[in-house]
UniProtKB/Swiss-Prot annotation:
The keyword Cell division does not apply. The lineage of its organism: Bacteria, Bacillati, Bacillota, Bacilli, Bacillales. The gene is yurR. Signal peptide: none annotated. Its cofactor is FAD. GO terms for molecular function: oxidoreductase activity. This is Uncharacterized oxidoreductase YurR. It comes from Bacillus subtilis (strain 168).
Length: 372
């Protein structure tokens, strides 16, 4: 039985651990629970089909990620994980400019040709749109995508790790440094113990370079600070409201029990130690959210989460074996799409590590692209 160590238990590491453990491999996950982990802060929107990004390699990952959720949730439920944080509630992409919605609708139909999981595509009037999300401002028409979903990153990650543990995986809280000799990574050293492994997989997000640097590897991962606000409405049944995708770079989505989430900021100049909830960040999120959904004004602001989204060069994720080092794999750079791509990419990474055929050609995502 082969043994694998995963360093970093965000959505990507948790998914990789689960899919490796399902094969009977011996899996150890090590994570120091760093404040600011992207998955822990994230509220995910699974609706990549309307994206205007032109990078086809990025889109193939996002499309595969959205498609994979149905199978993944079924697998997790069979493993006794009922609180996955995932719910297919649909999404409304809203706008006041009908011509913009025309183009969006056209894009959705084109994308549905090879992504039937998009579901129904429906053009909604302003009144129909507001009926689905009652706190919206008047005047927003929309394109409704029935196959879109929301994800609570914290809950999904917990489910994946719990299911992995049921399959024999061990999850350890602590620091991990790589053990390296004669060009081969042989395991890791934690605060208290050494662990040997056939391969080590680094899925440490914004902190990956810190782990790889002692090997003489400069891993080019940058990060963006995000502040995400949570609200509570006491008089609304929000559990089935769709995700709202406004014309701006923000989003609004709802969860059960009156919880509304709005965000997020995109801060490029913050350091990894800057976990502050700032006045400017709050102002940005609130002003953009209230412009779109003035009905949010009476909601209680209950929490602001801070996370650091990791990006690799060209804003394209990397996944695979680290060049010129035996026994070392890395995956990173999912940015703001972590909850769309992460579970699928973890499944693909597990196949790659095991020497099995992956669903996608992973060559465009070679980690060599992130090495200086």
């Amino acid at each position: 039985m082969k043994s694998y160590i995963i360093v970093g238990a965000g959505i990507l590491g948790a998914s990789t651990a689960y899919h490796l453990a399902k094969t009977g491999a011996r899996v150890t996950v090590i994570d120091r629970k760093e404040p600011g982990q992207a998955t822990d802060a994230a509220a995910g929107i699974v609706c990549p089909w309307l994206s205007q990004r032109r990078n086809q390699d990025w889109y193939q990952l996002a499309k595969g990620g959205a498609r994979y959720y149905k199978d993944l949730i079924h697998q997790l439920e069979k493993d006794g994980e009922s609180d996955t944080g995932y719910k297919r509630v649909g999404a409304i992409s809203i706008h006041t400019d009908a011509s913009k919605l025309d183009k969006m609708e056209e894009r959705a139909y084109k994308r549905r040709e090879d992504a039937p999981e998009i579901g129904d595509i429906t053009r909604l009037s302003a009144s129909e749109t507001k009926k689905l999300f009652p706190i919206l401002a008047d005047g927003y028409e929309s394109v409704h995508i029935s196959g879109a979903a929301r994800v609570n990153g914290r809950a999904l990650c917990r489910s994946l790790l719990s299911a992995a543990e049921k399959r024999g995986a061990t999850v350890i809280k602590g620091n991990a440094s790589l053990l390296f000799e004669n060009g081969t990574v042989t395991g890791v050293q934690t605060d208290t113990k050494q662990f040997a492994a056939d391969a080590v997989i680094v899925t440490a997000g914004a902190w990956a370079n810190e782990i790889l640097k002692p090997l003489g590897i400069h891993f080019q991962v940058s990060f963006q600070k995000a502040q995400i606000m949570h609200f509570e409405m006491t008089d609304a049944d929000t559990g089935s409201w769709p995700v709202v995708m406004p014309p701006s770079d923000q989003y609004i989505l709802s969860f059960d029990n009156g919880r509304i989430v709005a965000g997020a900021t995109h801060e490029n100049d913050a350091g990894l130690d800057d976990l502050r909830v700032t006045a400017g960040g709050q102002h940005e999120v609130l002003s953009k959210a209230l412009a779109v959904a003035p009905g949010l004004a009476d909601a209680a602001a209950v929490e602001t989460r801070v996370g650091f989204r990791p990006f690799t060069p060209g804003f394209l994720p990397v996944v695979g074996a680290v060049p010129n080092v035996q026994g070392l794999y890395a995956a990173n750079g999912l940015g703001a799409s972590g909850l769309t791509m992460g579970p699928f990419l973890g499944a693909e990474l597990a196949k790659l590590v095991l020497g099995k055929q992956t669903e996608l050609d992973l060559s465009p995502y070679d980690p060599a692209g992130a090495l200086a």
